[in-house]
Amino acid sequence: MRDIMGMMGKVKEMQAKMEKMQAEIAALEIDGTSGGGLVTVRLDGKGHMKSLKVDPSLFKEDDVEILEDLIVAAHKDAKDKAEAVQAEKTRELTAGLPIPPGMKLPF
């Protein structure tokens, strides 16, 4: 019985830590860039775009396709960085727990 109570306490502790981690991640702002800094996309920790900055030199009619590609690339860069931060925070939180490889948290 004592083991079950101890385990329940650990579960509640883990839940509180997970909620704190999720709040920290949601508050993050991550920049992704492309074109050597000509395009910058800022995402929040949930992956929502907060801002987009484009160097005025890209506003030429024949450069529209390039601009579109750079925006997509900057967004991907920011999203990849956000996912890496989330994965690292999750690894730190779950260190030592027997969680199967590839299982994404929170469930």
UniProtKB/Swiss-Prot annotation:
It holds the Pfam family YbaB_DNA_bd. Keywords: Cytoplasm, DNA-binding. GO terms for cellular component: bacterial nucleoid; cytosol. Its main location: cytoplasm. It is found in: Cytoplasm, Nucleoid. GO terms for molecular function: DNA binding. InterPro entries: YbaB-like_sf, YbaB/EbfC. It comes from the Bacteria. Belongs to the YbaB/EbfC family. Homodimer. Binds to DNA and alters its conformation. May be involved in regulation of gene expression, nucleoid organization and DNA protection. This is Nucleoid-associated protein R00231.
